[in-house]
Amino acid sequence: MNTTSNTTARIGFIGLGIMGQSMAGHLLAAGHPLALYNRSREKAQALVDKGAQWCDTPAQVAAQSDIVITMVGYPSDVEQVWLGSEGIIANARNALLIDMTTSSPELAVRLAAEAEKGGHHALDAPVSGGDVGAREAKLSIMVGGDPAAYQ
């Protein structure tokens, strides 16, 4: 990973629905440089107004982030954002990639393997707590993946 400390990590966040918007907002409020992407830009505007950077594609988010977090709707959305020539795996630079979408174990294993081939670390980190937990920064996060990446 390209980071020297957690406080200077450039974070990318993809997926600004009910949960993602609050989660990204907490990262921004904590002082992290934040690059954002969402299918509908208007969901990002409040965070952009507070200093986050809008990116036109997931690839742009990945290219400028040390850590990329995805919180999208469905496993098929995860595949679209992570895989392919415009995905985050192909465009990140030695990054930590974290998927917080509720998905399948098989997809998590596949993404971790693809990320490793691309020179990245990947963690599967679905959350529990709903929109209230996200708003109040009280989500429970169940993390799976390489212990070294988690540290």
Language-model features: where?
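General structural feature for long, well-ordered alpha-helical segments within catalytic domains
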Residues: 15, 19, 23, 43, ...
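Flexible, active-site-adjacent loop/turn segments at secondary-structure boundaries
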Residues: 14, 76, 86, 125, ...
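NAD(P)+-binding Rossmann beta1-loop-alpha1 motif at the extreme N-terminus of oxidoreductases
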Residues: 1-70, 95-96, 100-101, 131-134
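Rossmann-fold NAD(P) dinucleotide-binding segment
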Residues: 58-70, 74-121
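Rossmann-fold dinucleotide-binding core
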Residues: 11, 102-151
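A short linear-motif detector with a strong N-terminal bias
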Residues: 32-33, 47-49, 78-79, 118-123
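Short, glycine/charged-enriched secondary-structure capping and boundary segments
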Residues: 26-29, 49-51, 82-86, 111-115, ...
